[in-house]
Amino acid sequence: MRQPAVANPVIKESQFEGWVPEQFGQWKTISQSGVVLPPPDTLSDRLYDNLITQVYAAPGLPAVMLLLAYNNAQDGVLQVHRPEVCYPVGGFELSATREMDIQVGSKTIPANFFTATSPNRIEQVAYFTRLGRAYPRSWAEQRIAVMQANLEGDIPDGIMMRVSVLSADAGRAEDQLQDFSRAFITAAPAPLRRVLLGTAT
């Protein structure tokens, strides 16, 4: 059995940023601030090749905060930070995480949803992670995805797409974040869509 090798090249930061649409459908970029970021640590420079934050607005809807975190090589040490780590570090208390799905055409993306609460902010959060061909919903599934790819001879790439809104209404926010995610992925240029979905389409 051959040693696992990196299956995907590094994507230049400027190239990755250029793939992220500033406007699609009714949504338009208004800011890059206000997004809860992964905590800094000794691995920060190695955790992500690309870390993008944007805030999108649409008429009559709460603004959506977007975070994309990508690394071309996810091994047993360097794995995408899950939001359940980032938010408590920022002083938030979290609800239980529940499963949700994001439907993009014929593809169903397994995702997670939770509520993050701080003294001055209630944020509804949805996210998914892709590692190689897998969409792990938990740390355990994430580790299994890395091991399975390694057994196939690959060190997989990994991305997390996280979207959130400031709202006390979890049900309405979940619907909005599903709709936003579907529209964003559909509108993304082919290279970004391939990174998000792990396919050439």
Language-model regions: role of each:
Residues Q3-Q23:
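Alpha-helical transmembrane signal-anchor/signal-peptide segments
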Residues S31-A149:
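Short, solvent-exposed recognition patches
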Residues L51, P156, D179:
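Short, well-structured alpha-helical interface segments that form or flank functional binding sites
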Residues A63-M65, P156-V163:
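Glycine-rich, often proline-containing surface loops adjacent to acidic residues and nearby aromatics
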Residues F24, K28-S31, G60, I155, ...:
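Sec/Tat-exported extracytoplasmic proteins
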Residues N150-P156:
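Accessory, solvent-exposed terminal regions and/or long lumenal/extracellular loops of proteins
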Residues I159-T201:
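Surface-exposed amphipathic alpha-helical segments
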